[in-house]
């Protein structure tokens, strides 16, 4: 084992070991496509089928974005490097001029102190400018990832709205319907499948979001992905409570 392999054991060159330690987008997208077909076959006129169809399109776009964010944005990186080199060259030129014009004596020492103060200020400014230029690429990737995660979060809330009125107690106890009660046409088996489909969409939604955490090394993106996973877990928990009520009632 070389020094770099010891220092970075999970770096590049570990592709053969990532079959079961890295999320692969292909199987996830295939699962979403099959889930869309299953919902269309069982509930062709339902709003959930339209939600899953839109979610499939969003998942394909998000997967492509997550894959692209893994690569460097070369135009931005090249411009940032050139700008950083230009700033560095300007500071070096200023230091050379200071050294060339320096002379011994009281006036020269006073001029040296004043010039040194200016050089320190320029170095601080240059450091901030270089940090800004270097972080442009990361901030662009963060903005794109957060925008996609916002759409994935919206899908989760929409799925929750579709299962909101799916009350399992109608198959357990006798309840008198009112004029404002939502229309409930699903029998016990259909309601179980409907709720299960909602749970699957939420789980796959979190897996698509996890692709951004896997491909973008950014704390803000990782926090947003974790928040989305917690949201989908909580919504799935409510759905499975309804499924358990149906199972216990039977």
Regions found by a protein language model. Name each.
Residues 49-67, 83, 94-95, 193-209, ...:
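Mature extracytoplasmic or organellar-lumen-exposed domains after removal of signal/transit peptides
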Residues 24, 28, 51, 119, ...:
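Amphipathic alpha-helix face/heptad-repeat signature
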